[in-house]
Amino acid sequence: RYRGFDGVVIACVNFEDPEVIELIESNLPVVTIDRVFPNRISIASDNKKGITDLVSYIIKKGHTKIAYIHGRDSAVTRQRLTGFREVMRQHDIVVPQEYIRETDYRDIQRTAIATAELLKLPDPPTCILFPDDYAAYGGINAIKAAGLRIPEDVSVAGYDGISLATKIEPKMTTIKQDTKTMGMLAAEKLIALIEKPSTTEITSVTVPGILLPGATVTSQ
């Protein structure tokens, strides 16, 4: 037991934090969300497929000049970057190095700066992918500050499918992570791990996201 708990679901934390690592390495039943550890059950969004579906949709809309502002290095970021590069390569689309920018997840200010830099390129992108829906608002503000319209002048897409993204106009093109299913699976796995530790399989479960076409990606 840990502070009176029989088990813990770990999500939305810094997985490099020493206290988190100590908990993961303890004897307590643990299930992690969106991070895989040896000998631990994990529930993760299928980030590679999610970004692949999103970029494929954008390409079908006629875009080839697609920039990607991604989050800091992590397993999630690496999966999404791999998916992005693979689908672009499958369509024989060369991605200029200056089209790839790094920022922090949920960082509106840094995302706005990265977006402004992309817009100032001699050959700017026609569509910009953001690390998440929240950070996307920084990019949207930068696009509007440049006197450009979404999606008429620049198309944009986010990731996560937060409720606000579906309520603003135009509605955000994004991938909705199935957090409800992920939470339910995490709870089910943790209960099984607590009640039947010797027979519960230690495995990693991936949950597909859902493409929300929205209205921020226009046809070229």
Predicted segments with their positions:
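Anion (oxyanion) recognition and catalysis
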Residues: 24, 89, 144
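Hydrophobic beta-strand scaffold residues
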Residues: 28-31, 95, 150
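Hinge/beta->alpha junction and helix N-cap segments in small-molecule ligand-binding domains
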Residues: 18, 43-53, 69-114, 129-137, ...
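Conserved functional loop/turn residues at catalytic and ligand-binding sites
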Residues: 4, 27, 62, 92, ...
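Flexible loop/turn connectors
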Residues: 116-220
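Short acidic/polar active-site loop segments enriched in Thr and Asp
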Residues: 6, 63-65, 126
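Alpha-helical recognition/docking segments in bacterial nutrient-uptake
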Residues: 1-56, 60, 119-120
